[in-house]
Each structure stands twice: as structure tokens, then as C-alpha cells.
């Protein structure tokens, strides 16, 4: 899907694919990718072996470029590391660093809102490699579409889209879903 949209430098990682492109590609990826839950835009890379280093590195980011005092934010963390045992703790330390950055610089802080924040921030740690990203998708991409209410699906929509892509089906013939009730 990403290649068809014009993405460059594709690299497959653990539960993710990274790519490069311009802002137009970012919008296209959010609109067209059926096999993605989120499209993240990396803003800072660093190495860390403990939560204190994460805090110090996150605090180095010029957060006013991405977040203002009147906006809300939430942190999502994904951890694949023996050095970090608890993803929520990493999320809390990331949040603390952002809040402390604003307090030290502006004497005020933006609010945290877990549900429907203005800005989703993701921290991904693989071993000691850390990436801070802005979530360009907002709500999970599987929730886009015309349906007002979502019900439990027997198969994750993103997984189903990936399976169909692997079959090579291009929509030129009928598609029969034997699992459909």
C-alpha cells in the first residue's frame, strides 16, 4: 500500500513499517492505508537504558512546536526492551518531562486528557532505541468510515485488509467471504 502511494525508504520493523515522504504522502497514508491503525510522524530519536534518561531526553524537545498550553495531550507507549518493564511507567515519565518543560519555560502546563486529546504523542522503545512521534491519525484508523457505531468484529479489520492484499485480489471479480454469516 505504501509503495503504491509513493512512499520511500520502507523498513519493516516489529509491528510497524517506517517510510519517508512529504506531507501530502502523510495525508494519503492516513486516508488510503487499510493495513495501518496509526500513522506516526517521528520527531526525535535517542538511546536510553532507564526512565531517567527517557525523561532527560524527552525534555530536550522544543515542545511548543507541537503543543500549546491551551491544548490537551496523551501519551501512548510501546516497549520492546529488557531494560524497561512497564510501558505505563515510561508513558508517565514522558508526560512528566513534557509538563516540566512547559512549567519551566512558561510557568504553565498543558492538560493531559486520556480520551480524545488534541495531540497524541507516541514513545516507542526497541531495546535501547527510543523514538518520539506525533500521531498524525488521531483516532485509530480502523474507526474511520461511514459507520456511527462500531461493533466487535470477529477478525480485526486491519488484519483482514492485509490478508486480502496478500491474495492479490484487485477488485476485478467478486470476493466471497466464507466467514461472513
Go through each PLM region and give its residues.
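A generic local secondary-structure boundary/capping motif
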Residues: 63-65, 111, 120-122, 165-166, ...
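Hydrophobic, well-ordered secondary-structure segments
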Residues: 91, 95, 99, 156-164, ...
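Non-catalytic nucleic-acid substrate-recognition regions in nucleic-acid-modifying enzymes
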Residues: 1-117
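Conserved class I S-adenosyl-L-methionine
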Residues: 171-181
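Glycine-rich helix-loop-beta junction characteristic of Rossmann-like nucleotide cofactor-binding loops
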Residues: 63-67, 154, 164-172
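Glycine-rich, histidine-containing beta strand-loop boundary motifs that form or position
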Residues: 14, 134-136, 179
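C-terminal edge-of-domain segments
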Residues: 121-134
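SAM-dependent Rossmann-like transferase core, predominantly class I methyltransferases
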Residues: 132-166
